[in-house]
């Protein structure tokens, strides 16, 4: 900018000052531009989370960015974890980067604060500042700074000494910061700072410590602090700003505020101009050095050697087709300079294979590379399944290759540890990610702060659609919804704050899969963050920024299915020592018969009820079919499933857009399913190279009209040159457009379908071992354990109760069924379980409960363990029932303990050596008790195992429950979100609360069926109607809307059905079409609604839908709640006679 500002903001917080700052970076930049500021700084609390985003957006807007932090500084050493002599643990300090060296020092300082100095806050100390002060400007910050704190404590000499220390370290780049927010303590501090400035020759600077953009955003900032601290706005003595002056003020406002200290204003501009040369260099990904054996001269030569050796391992006969494909890929990889990347990936994959850590068949487009297949990075043959290399690495579009690797869930950490050891702890880290305040979540968070009852906020969020692109502003654009959200003053306050806070960062966490590796220490490129709850170190920058900053990114994903397959393999080898999952046939009839019958529960990627039905209809008979169904079963392409099935069955003739496309489309029966097929069509018809075809696919997928139009010209030109009719070629091009958006990555579908086939093979051929492995895989997940036990029963496999003489750590297969894994019992720690099994294997089975007590170490096994073990049924196969063991436990422990002590005393006595080393022990005389009741025994199993094994309280009601329920809580939740569902089971818990707003009652509970449990919410109206049914232990059915809030699914209950009437109930759907010319008669419309409501007689459930036409659009509306009646002919006839009704029908 050509103008010179009169004031520059150098103390600015964004929402990356988590749950403290309430300003989005884009809004900060917009305000700076609006205020004609040439520069602006970003100084978030202790971090650089938003630095790169801020830098780029400011540059784009023509504003010079100043990168800084408001650091937390320990008064003495950052390693001291206690309060200092001022009663504080850290103090604020502003640090600004003058140049790239200053920026690099900020990277170091903020990293040190998290990795070394964290104590409630990420802290640095004076040693760090002395070491990394070059290139930095420092100001004394707010009244939370060290110098202001000393002034407020009347320690004036100490304050002066601190000023002199900072002046010595930073020289002319240290400034005393003045703030005027209308706070008394600031006035006290400012007076002293002005005095010291003149005494000590340290310049002043003015600041406004902005935490939000505009004055009117003060309430939103106050609320976000409440969200962070768990406070309510009405709470007294909570943390909050003292005034509403902490916003980005205009130059005019700041000049007026500091008109008595013009030098403080001028110095903000001088500081900004010191930063004019600041520039961040973005080097792009820099590969770490990979050491190759001395006999090879280059990385490319070594990669070629490994590839050829790998091809010999993969293929019996190396045909010219295989070698040509491999050498073509190698030429592209080496030509683009990515041979080092392939070697790095190969190296840690080799470590995994060498250490028996299962690796996935592939993930994403990487499975399209034959070099990756040869190196065992992937495990699916790209030639066999016609997978394209250019979908992964396109020579016509330079971008870093990106292998996403699935590892066995249990082995993933070993891989990360290996990579860290190989390249160095300072060169490997995980990646940060940020949770944001999404529309529904922000409404609920703000509602809590404003003390709006949960029931009310939940009702409000019902009007907010789900989806990544939904915004509150769009919701409020609907006038009817706007009226709802502003119907009360407190709702207006809620929405005003929510609109400001929506989309802001809420918390930092670690990316589930991302790993970065650098050539030199990471802090040469990025700042680091440590999550002290998890103990993981991650980058402060998000995944999308890391490669341009100089890092190489990998995705290491933990896939439980690989752990499952490994466990199943190990179990099967007890009966088939040579079994290997890699050697199973790919055309097993038993497997495809099972899938064709829809018996795919617990089969990877095919377990949902919807997919089970599709398998029944499609009758897949090859892995190619599974790949296609896997790709089609998702929103968008799902509409083509009937066409696919009809063509596969021969019901419908297969149509190809052109005979030349038959080979490409034959595996999918003429339906374009894959992105790779779009590329192949562009190659065959338009004469495109596969690289150019990939660019076309991307343009179509992202709906880039200009780019598509340009490429269509090339496509038609190429088609004509190849002899195709222009009109037909144009039709084919237009046909590709929707499919490129719907089309799925075949490489990914193929790799995952291979894993799916492997799990299906295991279930079909080794069901007991497969289910045992599933149970072990989910040993700490009660819901999943319950599901797999039910699935085991459904396929005729008995899951046995825990048995002290037959059970092992994990679930195992026995002649009688699957023995229960001891690690799945609550209060039985792994060490204790190991001790029990080791003793049993060393000295034989336990003959009685007393024998067990005498043989185990009483220092390891305590009373709580024994009580849990008894209740769980662990000793049922021995001599006494559970009640008898439980009631005699204290006495038995006492007797055995006394015997052990007597034995020790005897061995230490003068005559002990003459006594028998194994004295005869008296058998314990039990006082016998009648066994617990059946329901009590089941209750114990639920308590200790997390579910029921020997039976289920719902067994008598199974038929009624199965006929009533429409929801499988393990497989249907995502698919049925926001829809009306029916669910029945036992009420495990009920909590009734009284709302603060009107003292009405509502309830929360948990209801469980055979497959798992789900939360229920019962608002006041429904609670009052059904309160007599909502008792703990009752078996009931509920009807309501399935919702997802705070990362949790729940059913908002509208109706409750007594167990006796479950089988009688079903939901009827009544459809009413209006005569549009009569819709304006509100009296008639209201009369109709009243008539429908009067139909309620508790005879059943009905949804009522209205159909009308408004503004040229057909609309379908639903009455708010489910109504209690069955639509008999008499009621329907009354509806048809209404003068505004055109038609009525029921389904």
Swiss-Prot record:
Keywords: Cytoplasm, DNA replication, DNA-directed DNA polymerase, Nucleotidyltransferase, Transferase. SUPFAM superfamilies: PHP domain-like. InterPro entries: DNA_pol3_alpha_NTPase_dom, DNA_pol3_alpha_thumb_dom, DNA_pol3_finger, DnaE2/DnaE/PolC, DNAPol_HHH, NA-bd_OB_tRNA, PHP_dom, Pol/His_phosphatase_N. GO terms for biological process: DNA replication. Coiled coil: none annotated. It is found in: Cytoplasm. Its EC number is 2.7.7.7. GO terms for molecular function: 3'-5' exonuclease activity; DNA-directed DNA polymerase activity; nucleic acid binding. GO terms for cellular component: cytoplasm. It catalyses: DNA(n) + a 2'-deoxyribonucleoside 5'-triphosphate = DNA(n+1) + diphosphate. Its main location: cytoplasm. The keyword Nucleotidyltransferase applies. DNA polymerase III is a complex, multichain enzyme responsible for most of the replicative synthesis in bacteria. This DNA polymerase also exhibits 3' to 5' exonuclease activity. The alpha chain is the DNA polymerase. DNA polymerase III contains a core (composed of alpha, epsilon and theta chains) that associates with a tau subunit. This core dimerizes to form the PolIII' complex. PolIII' associates with the gamma complex (composed of gamma, delta, delta', psi and chi chains) and with the beta chain to form the complete DNA polymerase III complex. Belongs to the DNA polymerase type-C family. DnaE subfamily. This is DNA polymerase III subunit alpha. It comes from Borreliella burgdorferi (strain ATCC 35210 / DSM 4680 / CIP 102532 / B31) (Borrelia burgdorferi).
